[in-house]
Amino acid sequence: MQSVIAQAKRIVVKVGSSLVTNDGKGLDYDAIARWAAQIAKLRSIGKEVVLVSSGAIAEGMQRLGWVRRPREIHELQAAAAVGQMGLAQVYESQFGRYGIRTAQVLLTHADLADRERYLNARSTLLTLLSLGVVPIINENDTVVTDEIKFGDNDTLGALVTNLIEGDALVILTDQRGLYTADPRKDPNAEFVDEALAGTPELEQMAGGAGTSIGRGGMLTKILAAKRAAKSGAHTTIASGREANVLERLAAGEAIGTQLLAPTGRLTARKQWMADHLQLRGRVVIDAGAVEKLTSGGKSLLPIGVVEVQGEFARGEVIACVGADGREVARGITNYSSAEARLIARKPSSEIESVLGHLNEPELIHRDNLVLV
């Protein structure tokens, strides 16, 4: 088995907090120097690299003299603001030794949920890569709340991979990779060297939360791989403690767990819809509509809508769920939530008489719909 990284041209590398900090006590300059050296090597063999790096909050805690990660959101935001300065400085310094420029890019979910901002972020990152710059990406923890509380850089790494149409995502952690069970508790646990991303059994194998410094456990990595696979990108989960792990992966050595994308890429527009983490509304659809969407590739008509939940405007991305609450698709709605409630369970021929106008005969056209 050969590493998929060997054939990848554009790679997103996510480095966890434990790999860039001294056990949470500020940044580990020597470790960051090693990451810069390895990425410089990848650049020298023609690969484009985007780095998603944790460590800002840990560095901020060190600079502020805090021993334990705070629970208050405003304190976490303050630590992130202070620590981001140090993180940017050390990366700039270390990459500068190889004549490589870096760029700091801080993102929030709102940046990727809005279509115009999404395209702007994409254009900026692709321009940076074309200029030979290594973008250093992190969540903009200073201005958001839910990302600090529930977010993680594994998910961000997958979103960035999809954003730039990357070939591969490398998630570096302090663990070897994925096991069938927790090897610390189960002596019969077997190592998983390769699997298809999105396989349901993988989520059952994955454990819970991460360290007290970081936020992501193995489950977040499995879900990140599943998300990245929707754009056709393969994911490697490997130990960042392995010597020269990035260089060895690029040389084709099989290290860690490879989660392969089972399908080709979604179109850019559908990828944007699939990557929405927060939706303002959803529609519950009947069994017939579920069948038409999942098997027939049809549009969603108002007559198939049983219930409208949430408040949304025309042009927003909403979820389509079955009677069991499971999301089957999502797409751009042609009608607001108020309008959708009025035309639900009605044939398209009655839309104009009910609303006084007709935007489209479909609630969501199949060209603006993606299965999940």
From Swiss-Prot:
Assigned GO CC terms: cytosol
Q: Which residues form the PUA domain?
A: 280-358
Q: Which domain of life is it from?
A: Bacteria
What broad class describes the main subcellular location of this protein? cytoplasm
| Entry keywords, A to Z | Amino-acid biosynthesis, ATP-binding, Cytoplasm, Kinase, Nucleotide-binding, Proline biosynthesis, Transferase
Gene Ontology biological process: L-proline biosynthetic process
Q: Please name the top-level EC class of this enzyme.
A: transferase
Protein name as annotated:
Glutamate 5-kinase
Q: Which organism is it from?
A: Cupriavidus pinatubonensis (strain JMP 134 / LMG 1197) (Cupriavidus necator (strain JMP 134))
Q: List the gene name.
A: proB
